Design a protein with these regions (language model features):
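Membrane-embedded helical hairpins/re-entrant loop segments and their flanking transmembrane helices
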Residues: 52-95, 275-349
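N-terminal signal-anchor module of multipass membrane proteins
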Residues: 2-99, 107-115, 119
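Generic transmembrane alpha-helix signature in multi-pass membrane proteins
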Residues: 48-52, 60, 109-118, 141, ...
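Short, non-helical or kinked segments that cap or interrupt transmembrane helices
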Residues: 71-72, 93-107, 149-158, 212-218, ...
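Intrinsically disordered, low-complexity non-transmembrane regions of multi-pass membrane transporters
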Residues: 1-32, 237-261, 297-302, 446
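Hydrophobic, membrane-embedded alpha-helices of multi-pass small-molecule transporters
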Residues: 27-44, 185-196, 214, 230, ...
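Membrane-embedded alpha-helical modules
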Residues: 115-233, 354-446
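Hydrophobic alpha-helical transmembrane segments of multi-pass small-molecule transporters/permeases
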Residues: 29, 33-37, 130, 154, ...
């Protein structure tokens, strides 16, 4: 039986923002959609920058040019928007019909770098592996009814908690200024991050009605404004708008994303590269299963349905294959946006569709994407720490519903002892194995 949140309605109303179906006036839908985009924008582009800056070309051993990397960032926005549309409004059995945002996954970084930096495979071999791996995961999703019985409630709860735990350092890294930056932990990063978090909390209490759930967007705007003030006043270099000018020089104001088959870097399909990445797609499937479960339990107040699991994983896989066709990296459901959905209870698909369309629009106008990308990491960190914690909270609520017996104790204990423990070891636990094994498991609690 469908809950009141899921009733089939076609009307336009502000109250629909808390319902799955129906439309919301654009003056409300666009800000809430934009909030989702800002929550994931930098994380969506960062993996592309990391991998594509290091990759070599199989054809000549050279690196991708700056203009080519900019075009791939453009493609990352485009495919994330397309993948989100498929999740929101399924085509046949492909899509969950749930408020899920898709984006480029960090999970694949290690394995993709192994392939992309191998001169015998290079960028072309990496793209071929992404296409094949995406198709593989898509069919794994479509066959979910055959293996769903092994995914018990306690396992699902552990996966959701693990996702939340794995994101906690991501939020704190951002608050500190971003992982690997020279001025990490500088006072101005901490001040701007704290200011952003305080604005988020205060606006959630002060604003009334649906507007209180725009607290993350309000925090982003005020935090960004403070970062600009610090930059203009010469206090700290937190915002750099030079990327906008550089983007216009390299790809222009308007540009259509290109299929990789129409470039000089056509994909190469290598069986070894596929096997390197296939197991990571299974890990990604576990993450998406946990994220989809968190949406259903945390936002809709019910268990995950088989057709939703099947459709969600199918999009996870097939949209990754589409991403590969544009020369980009695999997609997955974005956990920070799952946290935003469960925290605000804004589940309306039309509203989140506005976010997907903003992503697609930003891909067609690269300077717009460059503007979003200028958002300081500290501002994002201040906004996301609470969202990431809310994912872990939903997992704990799911675990509370499980029967606490010896079997549950063993599953939970071993899941976190091994899963989380591996991410905390002082060295490479899998040093005796091929490097790809360590790349997959050492830094991934899920």
């Amino acid at each position: 039986m469908e809950s009141n949140k899921e009733e089939k309605i076609t009307s336009v109303s502000e109250e629909n923002i808390y319902k799955l179906n129906g439309r919301v006036p654009l003056r409300k839908a666009i800000p809430f959609g934009l909030q989702h985009v800002l929550a994931m924008f930098v994380s969506n582009l960062a993996p592309v920058l990391i991998v594509c800056s290091a990759t070599v070309l199989r054809s000549n051993g050279a690196h991708l040019s700056s203009a080519e990397i900019t075009q791939l960032l453009q493609c990352a926005m485009f495919v994330a928007g397309i993948g989100t549309c498929l999740q929101l409004y399924p085509i046949g059995v492909i899509g969950s019909g749930l408020p899920i945002i898709m984006g480029v996954s960090f999970t694949f970084l290690g394995s993709l770098l192994v392939i992309a930096t191998n001169p015998d495979l290079g960028y072309e071999g990496m793209v071929g592996a992404v296409i094949l791996g995406g198709i593989f995961e898509g069919f794994v999703g479509l066959s979910a009814k055959y293996w769903r019985k092994y995914l018990t409630p306690v396992v699902s709860a552990c996966v959701v908690i693990a996702i939340g735990l794995s994101l906690l350092p991501v939020g704190m890294d951002s608050w500190g200024g971003g992982s690997g930056v020279k001025d990490f932990g500088s006072w101005y990063h901490l001040v701007v991050g704290a200011f952003t978090l305080i604005v988020c909390l205060v606006s959630r209490e002060v604003l009334k009605g649906v507007y209180k759930n725009l607290n993350v967007l309000v925090g982003l705007v005020f935090g960004y404004a403070l970062a600009i003030i610090f930059t203009v006043a010469g206090i700290a270099p937190m915002v750099d708008f030079s990327g906008i000018h550089k983007t216009i020089q390299e790809v222009g104001v308007f540009s259509i994303p290109k299929l990789v088959f129409l470039t000089s870097h056509k994909p190469v399909f290598n069986l070894g590269a596929f096997f390197t990445i296939a197991i990571v797609f299974l890990v990604s499937a576990a993450e998406t299963t946990g994220a989809t479960t968190a949406v259903c339990t945390g936002a809709l107040g019910r268990d995950l349905k088989m057709k939703e699991l099947r459709g969600s994983l199918a999009v996870d896989g097939f949209s990754s294959a589409i991403s590969g066709c544009f020369g980009c990296l695999p997609l997955t459901s974005f956990s920070q946006n799952i946290g935003l959905v469960t925290m605000t209870q804004v589940i309306n698909r039309f509203t989140i569709l506005m976010g997907a369309l903003i992503l697609i629009l930003a891909s067609l106008f690269p300077p717009l994407g460059a503007f979003f990308n200028s958002l300081p990491q500290a501002v994002l960190g201040g906004c996301t720490v609470m969202m990431f914690g809310s994912i872990m909270y939903e997992g704990i609520k799911m675990l509370k519903e499980c029967k606490f017996d010896d079997r549950t104790m063993i599953i939970v204990s071993l899941s976190f002892s091994i899963g989380v423990g591996l991410t905390q070891t002082s060295g490479n636990f899998f040093a005796a194995f091929p490097s790809a094994v360590g790349d997959v498991f050492n830094g991934n609690a899920v």
